[in-house]
Amino acid sequence: MTETPPGALPVPYVPGMSGLSVMARGGYATVYRATQDSVGRDVAIKVENRTLDNPRDQARFLREARAAGRMSSHPHVVDLFDVGVTVDQHPYLIMELCDGSYLDRMRVSPLDPVEARDVGIKIADALVHSHANGVLHRDVKPANILYSEFNAAVLADFGLAVLGEMRDSSVTLEVLTPAYAPPEMFRHDSPSGAADVYALCATLYAVMSGRPPRWESNRSPSILTLMDLFNHPIPELPGVPERLVAVLRYGMDNDPTARPTAEQLRDLLNNLHLDPSTPQPPPAVYRAPRPNHVPPPRPRPIPPSTPTLDETPTVHNNPDRKGFFQKWFFGG
């Protein structure tokens, strides 16, 4: 794989596209806004900074394209229109154009509980569809949940996705977004849908609090501190109903087999009425159907409301590089 500094990439030539202008640059890719000439449609083009020099890189790009294409029929997954490789061997994906991400939103103003719950229902439903089709996302985080004028939440970036026929666990610390990753991903356990559930619950917590679960400030903790944080209770959120926090704690249990499935999480959120003045019975938990190719975790009863123990993948080949940990932990 050959890396090209993002600022050094010239505007690429993509057949059938015109008016390319940079929307965002990162260590992993550059995203352009463009017009699809044949239909006059505005689109987003993600051009990776690397070139496809070896079979592993080619397989990873194909994995993302196949996973995104397989999922894009869902209303809350970003539409993928086409893929290809530029003349200088940079892979690209042509996708639905969105207005921004929930990482942008949470930096400006945290979401209220009702909006966060509604985003959770939509993305959990996308994960239900994904897991039922043998696709694990593995990088759910605020930067990968986008919004537009016509769609409040869509899941993007299947760059770390695992397909049912490719059950590898080749996610290294360099490509994790640790703020939203469950403890088993640091142990390189076999991929499962439980990791996506954890990441979604951590994301919903973050968009309401303005920072990831258990973090006391916006400063990035050391890796040792981060691992110790998994043993700390997840705090309450001021102004957020305890019942919503309890559901999120349930999804962020340190034991992946104790978390709800994506389907259970979706239904728990969907049945959660957030008027604090209205008494409610505990939400029911049931065992969701188990797809053959993606074994879901085993459910357990909903925990009490009291605390219990418990952005585009950022790829860096040189962890000692200045600024690595800040970008790595925040997923920006």
What do these predicted regions represent?
Residues 20-27, 31:
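Protein kinase glycine-rich loop
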Residues 49-70:
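AlphaC helix of the eukaryotic protein kinase fold
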Residues 79-89:
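Short beta-strand micro-motifs within the conserved protein kinase catalytic domain, predominantly
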Residues 87-101, 105:
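Conserved short submotifs of the Hanks-type protein kinase catalytic core
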Residues 123-135:
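Protein kinase catalytic-loop region centered on the HRD/HxD motif
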Residues 225-239:
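Short proline-rich PxxP-based motifs
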